[in-house]
Amino acid sequence: MAEERNIEFFIETIFLPQWPFKDSELCSLFGNLLDNSIEACEKIKKGKRWIKVQVEKQNRLLFLDISNSIEEKILVRGGKLITNKKDKANHGYGLKGIERIVNKYEGEMSYQVKGNLFKIIITFFLNANSG
């Protein structure tokens, strides 16, 4: 999908024998994160389009770090990311789904915007049975 849209895709990950959440939530989490990254890259008219996914574990912490190139300004209200689509009432559900999963598993989510870089970092605490 990224290749079809002229987006360079990089991935660095570890193997986890068991994720701390359900398979459907894992698909929803990564699906929404990648959909948002691809959509942001598609808006870039000039410049490099890229997405980088990193998954790493340090002791009992699991880090999901997804970064991508951007062109448009990121909208933030009350510390939350806001959709920049015209029909706001029917958009933003992907972000809400991500937040729901992060909150359900008592994770933390932060983001950074620096120039043409957007990065979202999600951290989960792993119990003794996970990974």
Language-model features: locations:
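Short conserved segments within the C-terminal catalytic ATPase subdomain
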Residues: 2-10
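Glycine-rich nucleotide-binding loop
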Residues: 72, 114-121
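Glycine-rich/acidic phosphate-handling loop/turn and adjacent ATP-lid/helix
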Residues: 60-92, 131
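Conserved short strand/loop->alpha-helix "switch" segment adjacent to the catalytic nucleotide/phosphoryl-transfer site
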Residues: 10-29, 89
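Short beta-strand/loop element within the Bergerat-fold HATPase_c
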Residues: 48-60
